[in-house]
UniProtKB/Swiss-Prot annotation:
Record GO terms (molecular function): NADH dehydrogenase (ubiquinone) activity; NADH:ubiquinone reductase (non-electrogenic) activity; quinone binding
Membrane-spanning ranges: 8-28, 38-58, 62-82, 106-126, 160-180, 200-220, 234-254, 268-288, 300-320, 322-342, 368-388, 398-418, 445-465
Cellular localization per UniProt: Cellular chromatophore membrane
Alphabetic keyword roster: Membrane, NAD, Quinone, Translocase, Transmembrane, Transmembrane helix, Transport, Ubiquinone
Gene Ontology CC annotation, any one: plasma membrane
Species this protein is from: Rhodobacter capsulatus (Rhodopseudomonas capsulata)
Enzyme class, first EC level, given as a word: translocase
Protein name listed in UniProt: NADH-quinone oxidoreductase subunit N
Family from the record: Belongs to the complex I subunit 2 family.
Null mutant phenotype: No functional NADH-quinone oxidoreductase complex. Cells lacking this gene have a nearly normal respiratory growth phenotype on lactate, however they are unable to perform anaerobic photosynthesis. It is suggested that in R.capsulatus this complex may function in reverse flow under physiological conditions.
Catalysed reaction, written as an equation: a quinone + NADH + 5 H(+)(in) = a quinol + NAD(+) + 4 H(+)(out)
Main location, first listed in the record: membrane
Length: 478
């Protein structure tokens, strides 16, 4: 390993060393008594690394192509690190007051983030699998963090069992690809794939690879775990599931299809378009009957991942750019929405029933309006930023020749808007009921308001995010 190669992986190495160091520190100094300092130290460490990575330049590889450090990886890592730090910060009060703030919690989040950083920089099937499993193993544990709850334990077990199945599918696909290509590096695989023609063995391998990765983004028909895990996990953990891991998996799909199978976009574009449509419609239709806001956010996530996959299905740099923009905006919307969900309490106990929001506009108009903005943005109502995110994805798909798919996407978006607008109806026109507690920690309130402001102001100026996404996409698709 040369000095140049080591410098490329330095952020991942530093974060891994930090995780192992604070794990030992926590064990030796009283475990949960140091949970809050570890949580805040972890958030600050990830923000510092995001700044360092964001200032990086160039497109390089390390370890014989196992690790790729390009603009696409840097953009994805910055968003992952910032979103993970935000979720940690806004979860401190919630976890502490419910006795869930154990010192392992922030460490598991950090280890999952290390795995995600490996995923977006993977240049080989082996590094892909290592990153994916590091993320998954940490998330299996954190889903069942509430050990005295049967629902939380069930969520963790269900996620583990189905996640193991998806890992098996991915490994089978990787073995097929290696068997027919004779190499595990993406740069080697793409030399085997002929322009416009994909050998049948590699096609089957690609299908199984995409099936394994589709599980991670909750794409239909690999979405079965999502509603139960979102509902059963502690709410801050659900917020984490809905943000950083989704971008990491989506970025990994983009890396695989463009770096390893970029010669045949027509083959995998059809697969991704089918997954996208199925996800959009199931998420939109199944969410209509939900009465629990965490389950509703699960189906919302499934539908939104369909739009992200539609951008990738285009098979162009514009498609990757639209996906990165969409996922970034989606993460901001979710951070703000979950900041509000964390504050939903009645008589000091958390509530997640949507009906609990009845006439919130009368008791807390500022929070109600901020949530209205975020819900309108999630629904894709102009002039909110969420509308422009969907517009960018649909425009990229039309530019790639998928005319009928964007039309179907618009219909799915209209159907899905119903359950967001139903929440707005409850807040402004619902029946009178026992009000929610007015308590909301200042940090959670700040995340809620800032996310709402971003959805309004971002339509005017995205503060350089659009240009950064364009440069990131150009570094991947060349």
């Amino acid at each position: 390993m040369t000095k140049a190669e080591f410098s490329l992986v330095l952020p991942e190495v530093l974060l891994a060393i930090y995780a192992m160091g604070v794990l030992l520190f926590g064990v030796w100094t009283g475990k949960d008594r140091v949970a809050k300092p570890i949580l805040w130290a972890s958030a600050v460490t990830m923000l510092a690394l995001a700044l360092i990575i964001g200032l990086g330049t160039g497109n390089d590889t390390a370890f014989g192509g196992l690790f790729i450090a390009d603009g696409f990886a840097r953009f994805s890592k910055v968003v992952i690190l910032v979103s993970a730090a935000a979720v940690l910060a806004m979860s401190s009060d919630y976890m502490g007051r419910r006795g869930l703030l154990r010192f392992e919690y922030p460490i598991l989040i950090v280890l999952a983030v290390v795995g995600m950083m490996m995923m977006v920089s993977a240049g080989d099937l082996m590094s892909l699998y290592i990153g994916l499993e590091l993320q998954s193993l940490a998330l299996y544990v954190v889903a069942a963090l509430r050990r005295d709850s049967a629902v939380s334990s069930e969520a963790g077990l269900k996620y583990f069992v189905l996640g193991s199945l998806s890992s098996g599918l991915l490994l089978y696909g990787a073995s097929l690809v290696y068997g027919f290509a004779g190499t595990t590096t993406f740069s080697g695989i793409i030399t085997v794939v002929e322009q416009g023609h994909l050998p049948i063995g590699l096609l089957f391998g690609l299908v199984f690879l995409l099936a394994g990765l589709a599980f991670k983004v909750s794409a239909v028909p690999f979405h079965m775990w999502t509603p139960d895990v979102y509902e059963g996990s502690p709410t801050p953990v659900t917020a984490f599931f809905a943000t950083a891991p989704k971008l990491a998996a989506m970025a990994l799909i983009a890396r695989v299809v463009h770096d390893a199978f970029g010669q045949v976009p027509g083959e995998w574009g059809q697969i991704l378009a089918a997954l996208a449509l199925a996800s959009m419609y199931l998420g939109a239709i199944a969410g209509i009957g939900q009465r629990d806001i965490k389950r509703l956010m699960a189906y919302s996530s499934i539908s939104h991942m369909g739009f992200g996959l539609l951008g990738l299905a285009a098979g162009t740099a514009a498609g990757v750019e639209s996906m990165l923009l969409y996922m970034t905006i989606y993460i901001v919307m979710n951070v703000g929405t979950f900041a509000f969900i964390l504050s939903m309490e009645r008589d000091g106990k958390p509530v997640t029933e949507i009906a609990a929001l009845n006439m919130l506009s009368k008791t807390d108009p500022v929070k109600a309006f901020a949530l209205l903005v975020l819900l309108f943005s999630l629904a894709g109502v102009p002039p909110m930023l969420g509308f422009f995110a969907k517009f960018a994805v649909i425009k990229a798909a039309i530019g790639a020749g998928f005319v009928w798919v964007p039309v179907a996407a618009v219909v799915a978006s209209v159907i899905g808007a119903f359950y967001y607008l139903r929440i707005v109806y409850f807040m402004y026109f619902g029946e009178k009921s026992a009000p929610l507690d007015g308590r909301m920690p200042a940090l959670q309130f700040a995340f809620l308001v800032l996310a709402a402001v971003a959805m309004l102001g971002g339509a005017i100026n995205m503060a350089g995010v659009e240009g950064a996404a364009q440069a990131a996409a150009a570094s991947l698709v060349n």
